[in-house]
Amino acid sequence: MKNFGQQIKTDELKGINHHNWSLCQAQSNTQKAKILFGRIPGGKLTRKLGWKILATGIIAQAVLLVSPAFANSTQKNLSYSQLLDKIQAGEVTEIDYYPSRGIAKVSLKGQRSREGMYIVQMFEHVPELLDQVRAQKIDFELKRSPDNSVAMGIIFNILIVFVVIVVLLAILRRSSQSQGNALNFGKSRARFQMEAKTGVLFEDVAGIEEAKEELQEVVSFLKKPEKFTAIGAKIPKGVLLVGPPGTGKTLLAKAIAGEAGVPFFSISGSEFVEMFVGVGASRVRDLFKKAKENAPCIIFIDEIDAVGRQRGAGIGGGNDEREQTLNQLLTEMDGFEGNSGIIIIAATNRPDVLDVALLRPGRFDRQVTVDLPAYKGRLGILEVHARNKKLTPEISLEAIARKTPGFSGADLANMLNEAAILTARRRKEGITPNEIDDAIDRVTIGLSLTPLLDGKKKRLIAYHELGHALLMTLLKNSDLLNKVTIIPRSGGVGGFAQPIMDEGMIDSGMYTRGWLIDRITISLGGRAAEEEIFGLAEVTVGAANDIRSVASLAREMVTRYGMSDLGPLALENPNGEVFLGRGWQSQQPEYSEEVAIKIDHQIRTMVFHCYEKARKIIRENRVLMDRLVDLLIEKETIEGDEFRRIVSEYTELPKKQKSLINLEKKI
């Protein structure tokens, strides 16, 4: 019954042994490529600098090749015959001959500078030119310039070879990386920290004192083992954290990592299994090999149910790889070889699907339940998360803790964060009770939307929600009403009647039959109000969620809690889902068809009785309902104390409700 109503890559270590020659050769080539581009610390160049050098070389080559051609395209040219004609005409004043380049630069009369000299392509033997130069008494000078053609050719060839080598090394590096990835499939993906700095200590964990004490003992054993070994105690090999989502299992693991001061490996259960056969088992072996090298240490496996589920037929036959991984995990945890100094901490919210061999002492010696926090736990969690929040003096963490039974630690943290966001949005200096109430509504029900404008629809929703609220106020075993509103919420919620849950009952899980029956009656109050006020033809689908929860609760009362005329019999397994590793046989009903008919009859009888009771109460208080509807349409929200005062004017309240009104009057 306790579960009713609850919603329940630091890099890998370096070093690979036993590689074949080809792999070593590939790695050597890859290393050269990495050194070239600065990927390893041993390289003299950084990667960016390597690429800059390559780009500079290519640009320089282009400049050297293009600049002469560009320069030549801007100069004035003369043919050899034109040069002879101009010499004969007496227009040439000076000739500079460059035999290594096979050209001559010619100055004509009227030129002011040597920059405008004409270029003439010369032949090897020019005797007639020399004769005419002597005859015309032209200045002729033989220029000796270095021959750069050979050097240019060498540079050009070197650059081409360099580019080809760079491209080949890049291709080789990529291929070797892909080959290395394939070979690294069997390596563990666990994140390793020599001294984990998670930023979380045990003082940051609140609300789960019993679980924290168990794990603090493990940390003490790692820090001071002689304290325990002196009296013959052995350190637990494994600790399994069990509890609903959001209760702080992973937070506890972070606190252990921050407090232990020993090497810490963390991995998710889903990271063991891949599509390739044998990869999971190989990763388990590699993980424990690294752990042994760093013992004493801690291995944290989050969501271990992903790899540790019950072995068996299950659905289909595609779970051999997972079973092989689990077998290897069982062997490493408590097999032929010991793992002294290695503590395994795992977390799951589905312990019922874990293999029994995984849960036995010697593997997981301790199972620590991290349950939803009670009042004191919620208060401690609120104090931790309120440290960095600006709260106004009227905020009472004790009152908030009493308003939030059934909240997990994650829910409380999210609620305070939503309150802080609302405060900033409303431009207030501190969080007030209004922001807290709105944040609780947002977390539990949904985002507040624009109020309805349609009069008929608004009135129908008002009657529906007041049907819940009126029954909540008049039934003697029900919870107290906190407020009723017709402001719509996200997710299709047109309004709601919010109860103040009995924290003692919620925290203990000890739900009474009277409370459960009244809960069914209250859930049917909305549909009953629609039918009584508007008639059967105007009944809407707004009660769909209510009817679904009623059917589920009534079936649990008959088949699990033994609260029907069938007697105290548990007729159904509480876990109705079929999991891998759980065969269909375990899901077959454990009763005959005749008993199944009786179960259906008991459920129908219980629900119909509650429905008729709800209709009767609404029918007898029709005048009160009409007044409350007008008030609710006007104000859109009625607080619980005001609602009880109005109801008390028309009818007598149950003892619990009446005592609350008397208390409010005294205040």
UniProtKB/Swiss-Prot annotation:
CDD domains: RecA-like_FtsH
Lumenal side: 72-151
Keywords: ATP-binding, Hydrolase, Membrane, Metal-binding, Metalloprotease, Nucleotide-binding, Protease, Thylakoid, Transmembrane, Transmembrane helix, Zinc
Compartment list: Cellular thylakoid membrane
UniProt-annotated catalytic positions: E465
Cellular component aspect of the GO annotation: plasma membrane-derived thylakoid membrane
The name this protein goes by in its record: ATP-dependent zinc metalloprotease FtsH
Gene name as annotated: ftsH
